Amino acid sequence: WNITDDLRFKASAGRYSQNLVAANSDRDVVNLFYGFLSAPDNLPKTFTTANGDVRDVKDPLQRANHVVAGIEYDITDHLSANFEVYLKDFRQVTNLNRNKLFNDTDEFADEPDELKKDYIIESGQAYGADLLLKYEKNNYYLWAVYSYTYVDRWDGFRSYNPVWDRRNNINLVASYAFGKFDAWKVNARWNFGSGFPFTKTQSYYGSTQYNGDVNYDYTTSNSNLAIIFGPLNEGRLPTYHRLDLGVTKSWRLDENQVVELDLSLTNAYDRQNIFYFDRVRFERVDQLPLLPSFGLSYKF
């Protein structure tokens, strides 16, 4: 809706469904890569909501209702602002059952589904706001965005923040083209993100695997190292931030042929951002250090 020539309002809403589930564990300290599997059909028959109501699970499809609204405003001929708010209401989400205690067999038929199924139903919400400022004039381009997000989940027993709940995120991008035919381009990008949730390690213990023999002597067996986890996702990882710089020089051979040389510097101030944490060895692995690189391309 064009309120004026400089002010616009926009909104959208929809109901979405999918039949995929992430193939990763929220017990990992850091999750940067995701695989996806088809969602399972063997789910609990009922789901207890956060307010205590019990509803039937009619099918395995995951569903969410999305609502987005925002305004765009042209502050000047070269500077514009975009502000959006959103709400995602996750009505039914499939997740691994971290509360499982029993096998899903006839022996435990009287136990509740929430304690024996491999997967459970969850619900939750994600809401937040995005503010974007964009400046374009001649060969200058500046782009700044701030995002605030809050995500929670309810698994039938407790409310918690999932591992992708990042409260604050900032992106700053700048580029400038100069020289004959704008043959030179320089660019910079800085990103800041507050820490993701993770579950702390509370303790370790030796897990003895019994073989079913009543004469089994557990005192002479070799135990496996097992972990006692702390409260679900009540820890927060360190903040993430990184600066990347780049320069591009192009040579136009004719209308259809261009040679480009790219020089870049990743993580320019050598920030130590966490990549992985080994709970057992209590060792941290960081992401890329300061990394220079170059590339040469030919386009025709």
Label the predicted regions:
Residues W1-N2, R15, Y73, L87, ...:
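Residue-level signature of outer-membrane beta-barrel architecture
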Residues N2, R8, N24, F36, ...:
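Membrane-embedded beta-barrel scaffold of Gram-negative outer-membrane proteins
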Residues A11-R15, N24, F83-L87, A144-Y148, ...:
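Transmembrane beta-barrel strands of outer-membrane/channel proteins
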Residues A22-D28, G35-A39, T94-K100, E107-F108, ...:
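Outer-membrane beta-barrel translocator domains and adjoining extracellular loop/strand segments
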Residues R63-V67, S123-Y127, W164-I170, T239-L243, ...:
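Residues that define the transmembrane beta-barrel architecture of outer-membrane proteins
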Residues N191-N224, R236-D244, T248-F300:
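C-terminal beta-signal and adjacent terminal beta-strands/loops
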